[in-house]
Amino acid sequence: MEEDWEQHGEKEEVPLPAKKPDANKWDGEDEEEEVKDSWEDEDELEEKKDEEKVETPKAKPKKTLQQKIVEKEKQKHEEAERRRLEKEAENMTPEQKLAEKLRLQKLQEESDLKNALDTFGVTTLAGGIDGMTPNTKEDFVELSDAIVKKLASYKSDPEYADFLEDLVTKLFAGLPSNNIRKVKGILDNLYLEKQKLEKGDKPKKSKGGKVKARLKLDGENQNFDEYQPKYDDFDEYDDFM
């Protein structure tokens, strides 16, 4: 019996036939395709493409009807002003045309300056008389001192006296007669004191024993209150102005 098992074991093993490929399948069909880990990679590519696209410029907002009306009215006004100036220029003398040209040039320069200040965020010019906006008595005193200081630099000019006469006339032309009379009295006293100083007279003592203050020839900020008159004493000077 043992011999039969040994003989059976010694028999050669018959190899199994190789499996034939399925004729219905294409070559390489069984190979696994490379699958992307996720769809996020594809989304990122799409976003990059969108960013690379040139943005289309947005169309300018259309003007409203009200804006168009305002703009049209402005154009009409400018055209009417231009025609008026042209008509006036036809009747002007050469001197008047030159003066008008200088006036327009000055206006243009002021407009350019204002635009430049607006561009840089400057609202007003710093300091100086132009920057003052007096409201109180102290403010007007400060303005007065600034004007006197400004004009003092021209007092040695030969035309200075004529300039002051013209300036005073223009300044007081619009004031009531009472104000003019008050200033007239101050000038009368100032004139008398000036005369005494120029002649070398000594100041007279008043009843109280005090010497009346002299006028400072070289001072810029003189106090003219001490020269204010009593108006009843100056009726004889009513024809001064």
UniProtKB/Swiss-Prot annotation:
InterPro entries: eIF3-like_dom_sf, eIF3j. Transmembrane segments: none annotated. Residues 28-45 have a biased composition (Acidic residues). Residues 1-99 are annotated as: Disordered. Its main location: cytoplasm. The keyword Acetylation does not apply. GO terms for cellular component: eukaryotic 43S preinitiation complex; eukaryotic 48S preinitiation complex; eukaryotic translation initiation factor 3 complex. GO terms for molecular function: translation initiation factor activity. Residues 1-27, 46-58, 69-90 have a biased composition (Basic and acidic residues). Residues 31-119 form a coiled coil. It comes from the Eukaryota. The keyword Cytoplasm applies. One of its GO terms (biological process) is formation of cytoplasmic translation initiation complex. Component of the eukaryotic translation initiation factor 3 (eIF-3) complex. Component of the eukaryotic translation initiation factor 3 (eIF-3) complex, which is involved in protein synthesis of a specialized repertoire of mRNAs and, together with other initiation factors, stimulates binding of mRNA and methionyl-tRNAi to the 40S ribosome. The eIF-3 complex specifically targets and initiates translation of a subset of mRNAs involved in cell proliferation. This is Eukaryotic translation initiation factor 3 subunit J. It comes from Culex quinquefasciatus (Southern house mosquito).
